[in-house]
């Protein structure tokens, strides 16, 4: 076979392989990086100590923030097998949750997870985050690895909870956590402990986007099973997942959950809701998914092209809205100017009428004064 044809065949094979891998794109969140903070409840929590401004690490199930300290390593093959075995159309609440194999962790891995807990605590308390505080309360003797630990913790926060860590004061090294959604999703749907659920929502939106903007319920549950969420099984962060995604998120209009037409027995599917379109975009969701794969959105040409088209349509809609607003403002300004002009004209007319009336009255008064009095008859 000629060399050129071999090269083309290799290229075609590679593209086909990439397409196959993309079919389970979001399932990559079952890797250890996400499993460290997603799969099982933690015995580790941060709480305020009596000394103002200091924090301590305590053991036990109670605490302000409780996230996973047990990493889970789930291979791509095992994830699919688990999903196939666990997904049902309407799983029973007695469904047993598969146990994840322990994933060996070193000291730096432990520090990453502890830093995630610490940052979530600060987010819950609505407090600024300082480098000094992270070094003092979490990093400690591993300060030479601070940047590596912070980078990995930031990735966890983004992929699992949908939070971005941003430095707001480079001189003092002050940071804040910012929700990836534009509006107040966390304030509305966070649980009692203030743990954000934006990452889960972005994951589901990603599944819908990558399945042609409409995902079968089974496809969504396959991905959620991979990251440790099962219908009917109470989750330590998200509560009962089925209620969350088929009721809460639907009620808040982030998701649309509908029966597939003419399906017997009934089957259901998910679409983006109007608030999802308003508060995020296909490009933002694709950027989120790309980070899961440690790549860039353009690595997925078909979805990237669709996201670019969506961005262009949004830009045109914003431009049209601005033009409409400007036209309305201009019309109101003209109306006000016209009304003001009419007011001035009417006022001038009234003033002239008053002047004319006063002039006539003055003339009459003078005329009366100049007429001599009639003499009395004797």
UniProtKB/Swiss-Prot annotation:
GO-annotated biological processes: negative regulation of transcription by RNA polymerase II
Keyword Iron attached: no
Tissue: Detected only in the melanoma and testis and not in other normal tissues.
Ranges annotated as biased composition (Low complexity): 64-77
Entry superkingdom: Eukaryota
Entry keywords, A to Z: Tumor antigen
Annotated Gene3D superfamilies: MAGE homology domain, winged helix WH1 motif (1.10.10.1200), MAGE homology domain, winged helix WH2 motif (1.10.10.1210)
Cystine pairings recorded for this chain: none
Annotated MAGE domain residues: 108-307
Region (Disordered) residue spans: 49-105
Protein name according to UniProt: Melanoma-associated antigen B10
């Amino acid at each position: 076979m000629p060399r050129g044809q071999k090269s083309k065949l290799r290229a075609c094979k590679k593209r086909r392989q990439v397409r196959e891998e993309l079919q389970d794109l979001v399932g990559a969140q079952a890797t250890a990086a996400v499993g460290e903070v997603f799969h099982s409840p933690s015995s580790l929590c941060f709480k305020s100590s009596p000394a103002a401004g200091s924090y301590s690490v305590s053991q036990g199930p109670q605490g302000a923030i409780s996230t996973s300290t047990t990493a889970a390593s789930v291979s791509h093959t095992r994830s699919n097998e688990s999903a196939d075995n666990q997904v049902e159309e309407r799983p029973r609440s007695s469904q047993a949750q598969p146990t994840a194999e322990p994933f060996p962790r070193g000291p730096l891995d432990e520090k990453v997870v502890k830093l995630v807990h610490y940052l979530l605590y600060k987010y819950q308390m609505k407090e600024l985050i300082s480098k000094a505080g992270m070094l003092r309360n979490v990093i400690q003797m591993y300060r030479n690895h601070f940047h590596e630990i912070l980078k990995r913790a930031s990735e966890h926060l983004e992929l699992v909870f949908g939070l971005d860590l941003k430095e707001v004061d480079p001189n003092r090294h002050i940071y804040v956590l910012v929700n990836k959604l534009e509006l107040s999703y966390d304030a509305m749907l966070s649980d009692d402990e203030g743990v954000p659920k934006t990452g889960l929502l972005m994951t589901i939106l990603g599944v819908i986007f990558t399945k042609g903007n409409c995902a079968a319920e089974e496809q969504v549950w396959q991905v959620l099973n991979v990251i440790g969420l099962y219908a009917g099984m109470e989750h330590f962060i998200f509560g009962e997942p089925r209620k969350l995604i088929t009721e809460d998120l639907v009620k808040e209009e982030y998701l649309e959950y509908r029966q597939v037409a003419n399906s017997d027995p009934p089957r259901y599917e998910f679409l983006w809701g109007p608030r999802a379109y308003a508060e995020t975009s296909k490009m933002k969701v694709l950027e989120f998914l790309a980070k899961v794969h440690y790549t860039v959105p353009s690595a997925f040409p078909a979805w990237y092209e669709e996201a670019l088209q969506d961005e262009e349509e949004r830009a045109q809609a914003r431009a049209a809205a601005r033009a409409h607003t400007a036209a309305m403002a201009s019309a109101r300004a003209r109306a006000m100017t016209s009304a003001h002009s009419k007011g001035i004209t009417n006022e001038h007319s009234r003033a002239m009428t008053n002047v004319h009336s006063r002039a006539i009255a003055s003339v009459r008064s003078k005329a009366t004064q100049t007429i001599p009095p009639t003499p009395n008859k004797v």
